[in-house]
């Protein structure tokens, strides 16, 4: 089983994250941020990755530290669970509709972290959640997972739908990219013989 647990404690947050890449999409998420919990539940369900997140953050300041630090810890957990990355599919692309919105998420589990994020929100907030934090989370996740990630909303009008289509798109892309390719026979999917450089 490809699993990992990460604990991260700073003066701003205390976070524990666990993942099982070969799970069934079970989630147990408690960050204290309702909308964010919803997005992480969706990520687990549609990626079929079991995700557990417990976060205690300085929400009296704002949601930034908790959101970013969960992205850091979850990215680290995925990277650790991938291990040598032998046999993985590596590349994947997902187009994700959410009513009037369509987003595209493309991933390369390359070991070379990068985020390209072309998403615009018509509103500054979704409930009490700052929409700019969606990018912060994706960046923290991509950098710490060691993946190249392109996220683009092709069109959309509702901020909730836009965010949800991005998280669901990541879920479906991750599901395909971390899957073991039976034809790869345990090989690292790179002509270099290694990923990450």
Swiss-Prot record:
Compartments reported by the entry: Cytoplasm
Listed EC numbers: 4.2.1.19
The keyword Cytoplasm belongs to this UniProt entry's keyword annotation: yes
Signal sequence, start to end: none
UniProt xrefs under SUPFAM superfamilies: Ribosomal protein S5 domain 2-like
This protein's UniProt keywords: Amino-acid biosynthesis, Cytoplasm, Histidine biosynthesis, Lyase
A GO cellular component entry from the record: cytoplasm
Pathway note: Amino-acid biosynthesis; L-histidine biosynthesis; L-histidine from 5-phospho-alpha-D-ribose 1-diphosphate: step 6/9
Catalytic activity line of the entry: D-erythro-1-(imidazol-4-yl)glycerol 3-phosphate = 3-(imidazol-4-yl)-2-oxopropyl phosphate + H2O
PROSITE patterns per the UniProt record, alphabetical: IGP_DEHYDRATASE_1 (PS00954), IGP_DEHYDRATASE_2 (PS00955)
Pfam families in UniProt: IGPD
Cross-referenced CDD domains: IGPD
Entries under InterPro entries matching the protein: IGPD_sf, ImidazoleglycerolP_deHydtase, ImidazoleglycerP_deHydtase_CS, Ribosomal_Su5_D2-typ_SF
Cysteine pairs bridged by disulfides in the record: none
Biological process per Gene Ontology, one example term: L-histidine biosynthetic process
Alphabetized GO MF terms: imidazoleglycerol-phosphate dehydratase activity
Enzyme class, broadest EC rank: lyase
Family annotation (PANTHER family): IMIDAZOLEGLYCEROL-PHOSPHATE DEHYDRATASE, IMIDAZOLEGLYCEROL-PHOSPHATE DEHYDRATASE HIS7
Membership in a protein family: Belongs to the imidazoleglycerol-phosphate dehydratase family.
Protein name: Imidazoleglycerol-phosphate dehydratase
Name of the gene: hisB
């Amino acid at each position: 089983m490809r699993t990992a647990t990460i604990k991260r404690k700073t003066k701003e947050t205390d976070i524990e994250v666990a993942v099982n890449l070969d799970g069934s999409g079970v989630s147990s998420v408690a960050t204290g941020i309702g909308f964010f919990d919803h997005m992480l539940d969706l990520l687990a369900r549609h990626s079929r990755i079991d995700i557990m997140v417990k976060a205690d953050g300085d929400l009296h300041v704002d949601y930034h530290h908790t959101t970013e630090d969960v992205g850091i810890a979850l990215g680290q957990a995925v990277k650790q669970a991938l291990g040598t990355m032998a046999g993985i599919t590596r590349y994947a692309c997902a187009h994700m509709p959410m009513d009037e919105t369509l987003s595209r998420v493309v991933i390369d589990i390359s070991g070379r972290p990068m985020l390209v994020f072309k998403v615009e929100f018509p509103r500054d907030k979704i409930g009490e959640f700052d929409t700019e934090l969606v990018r912060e989370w994706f960046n923290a996740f991509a950098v710490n997972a060691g993946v190249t990630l392109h996220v683009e909303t092709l069109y959309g009008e509702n901020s909730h739908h836009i965010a949800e289509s991005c998280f669901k798109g990541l879920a479906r892309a991750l599901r395909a990219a971390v899957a073991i390719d039976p034809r790869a026979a345990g090989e690292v999917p790179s002509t270099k013989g290694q990923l990450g450089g």
